[in-house]
Amino acid sequence: MNGLLHGLLYGLPIITVVLTATALGLWFERKFAARIQSRKGPTMVGPAGILQPLADVLKMLQKEQIAPAAADRFLFELAPILCGACAVAIAAVVPFSPTVIAADIDVGVLYVLAVNALILIPVWMGGWASNNKFALIGAMRAVAQSVSYSVPMVLSALVPVILAGSMSLSDIVRYQSEHHWFALWPTIPGLPAFVLFFLSSLAEANRIPFDIPEAESELIAGITTEYTGMKFGLFYMAEYIHTLIASAVASVLFLGGWDGPLYPGLHWMVIKTLLLFASIYWVRWSLLRFRTDQLMMLCWKWLVPASLLLVMAAAMYVKAGGM
């Protein structure tokens, strides 16, 4: 009972913060994209349009909930709920500061990678249950892409695990703090591992240039083709949460988390996460989409061998007494 109460006391604020941050991230992306395209972006709802995401949610809640006549209704309704839940669940083990963390477990890295893989289940459910060929093809592409890019993601995440000697995210941050992570990057495979993890995160979150599962010119809207209203909104929200949490996890694994000059704390974690979040959308609005063959060749021909070399380099660095 005490464990359940502890989880609720720490989990509910984390969920609230994640959802609020996702809404602000959506507003930020629109303003950021508008700047790139010489537009103004949202301006009408709230100061500088900051309440536009809230208006979008209210609009989606009022829309009619439609399901195809031949769809598997139970799985069709369940898929967006599970997709959103899996995306939020990853935030439970992310240490935003030494004290702001819902669950500081010893296998935090394993938990993050495992829950990230679970998102494939509701994605496939949504595509199959829709009884729509475009949704099914989008789901198949999403599964193939995620399974492929999970390999370099896992291998690149092993680099800080090997260096820190722990799978706890908090321990990895403390290791980086003790060894001055910004000074060690030139001497260990941290920087290339960060680049590989970042690219894999883009692919896992279906962000441009890796968004072939929902390529509008080919698949209308991918797995969300038949979804309307808030069910569509849950899939949409899950993508943004996934992107935000991926930025936070990358900050913890490779950028020192809450550690920083002068006064380490939550503010450094927020700054690093926002910078990565902004860079993801800078890439999105600057590059074109890969073809399927190019995407798979990049993964298996370049990223997987490079990540294997980095794991071996990290092990050799530790063996040579680099810790």
Residue ranges of model-derived segments:
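Selective transmembrane helix interface/packing segments
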Residues: 1-323
